[in-house]
Amino acid sequence: EIMPSLVGSEMCIRDRTNALELRRQLENEGAIFHGSSDTEVICYLVTRNRLRMGSIETAISKTMDVLEGAYSLVIMSATKLIAVRDPRGYRPLCIGTLPGGGYVFASESCALDAAGATLLRDVEPGEIVVADAKTGELRSIRDHVGRPDSQMCVFEYIYFSRPDSIIEGQSVHEARKQAGRFLAQEHPVEADVVIGVPDSGLDAALGYSEESGIPYGIGFIKNKYIGRTFIQGSQKQRENSVRIKLNAVTSTVKGKRVVLVDDSIVRGTTRLPL
């Protein structure tokens, strides 16, 4: 569903939690939901806990006690902007500073660039960061920080994130290039050209080319009006979308030995048409 979700005076953005169990519990207590988003469940939990405890920071920390799974949240009240990252740190969340003062939160640093902000640091796994409009201060609440099994989802570097983002000090572009270099070391072949599958496979292909010495070429043109195919409803829809999503540059690949680099295989729908 479209974000953000609003319940009372608290607004939450983005989540992935054990929502179904919590939703049923809240419904049994009289909550009425207006959509199917997990975010609405978190909004209700925070609002309920705040009514009981008074402090929104305490309410959020109490809510985190019962949440399971991956989530990165930005919660806005009348005077505070609050960033929350799940204790395992599955999803990224970062803090930026604005030129005229103030703070901004985003799941990727490239969003900070677009807002004219400067990357300050990442929100740590389990951390609650509060930007207070009254004091102008940034406060850290660390009740859930320090979990030993903290680990970011590897797909953030491989696929989800934009290559111009920096996550936990690591350039996504350079991480993908390095993956391509490792691939060239582990699977060297004789070929005439290295090409990547747009868009997230391009950086890895460039790394493969640099490591192997095989020239890099543009092998596909991507139809920018076709979104991610692996999330579409049926196999037929996915196959049709793949056919019109990518078109080969024949001058690059015709009659040549080609190394084709992609970032990953989820369903494998793209593989056969390519």
Identify the meaning behind each predicted range.
Residues 9, 16-274:
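PRPP-associated nucleotide enzymes
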Residues 1-8, 13:
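Single conserved hydrophobic/aromatic residue that forms the stacking wall/gate
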